[in-house]
Amino acid sequence: MSARFGPEDLLACYRRGVFPMADSRDDPRLFLVDPDFRGILPLDAFHIPKRLKRRVCQDPYRVSFDTAFTRVVEACGEPHDNRPNTWINSPIVNLYSALHRQGFAHSVECWDGDQLVGGLYGVSLGGAFFGESMFSRATDASKIALVHLAARLIDRGYVLLDAQFHNPHLTQFGLIEISRDAFKARLKAALKVGADFHGGSDGPAPDQSIGMSSSGGVSDSVTPAGMSSYSGSSLSGMIARSGSFTGSGAVQRITQMS
């Protein structure tokens, strides 16, 4: 891929349904991927296993959005025992950090005190969110980040959550696999949707009582582009089906759906 490949080229790739990867974190080259079959997480059928619902109800981590984007990408690219090598190299970190500064890439972070213990990142275009990678340094941290992401996407009017490939880790959340043509048809429709990751939606009004606590809760960062407080209403619904829950509204609503 050309050394001149920049953020605008990356956005153009996503609009076409392709995405970049590297052979390894030490290889500076990138290549484009256009899978024959695509893994997606249908937002209207997002499933949370019962054990994880109980875990989310316990509010074990403080969850934030876009407060440590580059740290999340770098953590996703760290090798570990089960994954000695990764596809996230320095050009990937730099490209997605540039998209984040432009407002097109976002992260979800899970914190235990001041320690970043899990999270994920991806790209937002129209009503589509393209999940890129996730990491976990504590029990269920990446899963909880994904639940909060799904709740936010539902709350903000998104219609497509792309997981790129079939991943056994994600089948518990309702992952399905569709053909390339079917994915691109869904993508074409999703790009016409005016969803906003940090803006309002046509749904219920935000619960302005949701904020940040030292041990748990949900928070937004504040940037010059402007970010609204996280309502949590979609997640409330998903949780509520599994029993009483006093946490964020979006968490409760999304568990009602499960």
From Swiss-Prot:
UniProt xrefs under InterPro entries: Acyl_CoA_acyltransferase, Leu/Phe-tRNA_Trfase, Leu/Phe-tRNA_Trfase_C
UniProt cross-references to SUPFAM superfamilies, sorted A to Z: Acyl-CoA N-acyltransferases (Nat)
Residue ranges with Low complexity bias: 209-220
Segments for region (Disordered): 199-220
Gene Ontology molecular function, alphabetical: leucyl-tRNA--protein transferase activity
Gene3D superfamilies, sorted: Leucyl/phenylalanyl-tRNA-protein transferase, C-terminal domain
Catalytic activity from the UniProt record: N-terminal L-lysyl-[protein] + L-leucyl-tRNA(Leu) = N-terminal L-leucyl-L-lysyl-[protein] + tRNA(Leu) + H(+); N-terminal L-arginyl-[protein] + L-leucyl-tRNA(Leu) = N-terminal L-leucyl-L-arginyl-[protein] + tRNA(Leu) + H(+); L-phenylalanyl-tRNA(Phe) + an N-terminal L-alpha-aminoacyl-[protein] = an N-terminal L-phenylalanyl-L-alpha-aminoacyl-[protein] + tRNA(Phe)
Pfam families linked: Leu_Phe_trans
GO biological process, one term: protein catabolic process
EC number assigned by the record: 2.3.2.6
GO CC terms, sorted: cytoplasm
Protein keywords: Acyltransferase, Cytoplasm, Transferase
Protein location: Cytoplasm
Similarity comment: Belongs to the L/F-transferase family.
Function: Functions in the N-end rule pathway of protein degradation where it conjugates Leu, Phe and, less efficiently, Met from aminoacyl-tRNAs to the N-termini of proteins containing an N-terminal arginine or lysine.
Protein name: Leucyl/phenylalanyl-tRNA--protein transferase
Native organism: Hyphomonas neptunium (strain ATCC 15444)
Gene that encodes it: aat
